[in-house]
Every structure is written in structure tokens, then in C-alpha cells.
Amino acid sequence: SSDLRDVVDPTRTRGRRAWLAAQMWALLALLMIPLESADSAGLTFEQATVDLPTYITSTPSVTAWLVVAVLGLVVALLAPLATHLGGLVMATLVTVLAALPIPVTGAISVGLNHDFATDSGALAAIGMTIAAACVLVEVLDGPDPAVTCRVSWQERVGAIITLAGGIVVTWQGQAGHSWLSDRWGVARVVLVIASTVWVVLSWLPRSRVRGWLRLGMVTIVLTVLGASSQLVPPRYLIGQTPAVNYLGYELPPAPTTGVLLAPGRPNIGFWTLSILGIAGYLFAVSIIKHRGEKWSGARIGSWIGAWVVVIYLASVGLWEYSSMQFSWHMLVHMTFNM
């Protein structure tokens, strides 16, 4: 089949929608730069605007909005000008990438276990972006069986990741307090409930009414995420050591060989990447075999074996200690490369 864009979008209808949405996205992100600067520095909007260059790099959260605005402008250029499907795929990847800067620079990067929360928040943001896009496609185009068949499983996986990531972030932020003991916790409970309803709806038969219900859940999730970013979780108010601030956990005692090779502190990000890498490869192989083509079992075994090594390294004590000693860090790094 042709990879020309005209085959699937001859009138550029989808491109115009994306172009308008990306422009709004970029403009709102630019507006957030002085607003976030003022909020972070305790200034008025006018004070932050007059001396904006000083505050753009004052905190990671302000710089994050600048990155989001730039990525929005990139999508605004790609959406109408791309002539091949590859350009649209690139715009999609940039859109997903733009979901990361804000979540990973918020309160989830503070305090004990923030390594778990940061990874979970980033994965939840990616899952939510993909799943929300699937919902939007169905609402705009209607419950077309051909479209539904292509995007339904993506929405389900994305919604599940959104829910799981949201639970981990809430657990870390509440720091052992009741989830209903403060405003941030209540907001996060609403988020978890909306995500749960979204997951359930994604598995039900498609209809226009259920499509709008799923879009309603997406709206609630996005609204609560935006509102909760302005609230302070209990974890944020707890003092932390330099080690916790940097690593997310206290420095463990001097290791032995057994400790380095035994199960340690897992890395959620690499675990997820490994599982998706294996699942995606097996899915691609199943498509190839469905077409009647052959695929070497040795290739499959090599691919899975490599990801199993990554899972092992991201789960043992060596990974935990590699964050604090350069020699062990390079050992993990070079093993990954090989």
C-alpha cells in the first residue's frame, strides 16, 4: 500500500483539526510560562512578565512549559505540511513526547519513593495521551467498526496504564496518610475513580453514547490532573535527606556480591519498556506469520533474551547501587548496550 498521505487524508481534514489544536496548545503553553513563573516565585503576573528571561529557567516546571510550547509548534507545522504518513506518525510521536515534561517536573519528583512516582507518572501521561486520542477519534468519526478495531486495544492498554500509574503516584504523594485527609488526596481519588470508569467503558461494546461517556471521563481526568498540580501533597511537606532528594531512597549499606546480584529496588520504567518490547515484537511476529511468512525462532529468542537481561538488571541490587557509584553505573550501562 502507498505511504502517501492522500490515500487516507485526501482533503487534509485531519490535518486541519490537528493544526488548530496544536496552535491552541502552543499558545496556552506559552501563556503558562509567565503564569508558572509568577506562581513558582511568588510574584504577580506583571512582575514575571516584565523580567521573563530571568524566570524561564528559574525552575524545571517553568522550563517544561517552554518545551511543551515548542513541541506544539512542531506539530502545528507537521500537521498541514506532511505529505507522507511518516510525517503524521512523527507528529503523533511529538504529541506523546509533549505529555512528559509537566508530570515529571511536578510534586511527584519530590520525597521518598519519587523514583517510583516519576516513572509511573510519566507512563500514565503517555498512556492517557494515547488512550484519549483513541476516544477523540471515535467521537469525531463515529463508531466506525474499521476504526474501532484499530484503536480499541490501544485505548484499553492506555487507560489501564493511566489507572495503574495514577494509583502509584497517589500512594507516593499521600505518604501513608488517608487518601481523603486532604484536598490533593481527594482530587486524586476522583482521578482514580474516573480512570476506573474509563477502563470499564473501554471494554464495553462501542456506541456513540458510550463514546461521549468515555470522552467525559477523559475530561474529568485532565481537569483533575490540572487542578491537583496546584495542590500540595502530604509527601511534599516531609523533610528529606540529600540521598532521598536525588535517588528517591536512602543510601543502603555497603553491598556484597550476593546483594548486588539478588533482587533489589526495581525500576518501573525499564520493566514497562521491557514488557512492551517483548509484547510488541510478538505481536509483529504474529502478523507476519498470519500473512504466511516465516520468522526465525532464533531471532525471537534473542530478542526476548535481551529484554529478560534488561528486566534482571533493572530488578537487582546492582541497579540500586549503580545510581550512587559510577563504576557500577557503567557496568549496567555497558551491559544494556551489549
Annotated model-derived regions:
Residues 2-256:
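Polytopic transmembrane helical bundles with strong interfacial aromatic enrichment
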Residues 18, 27-40, 51-69, 246-338:
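Early transmembrane hairpin module of multi-pass membrane proteins
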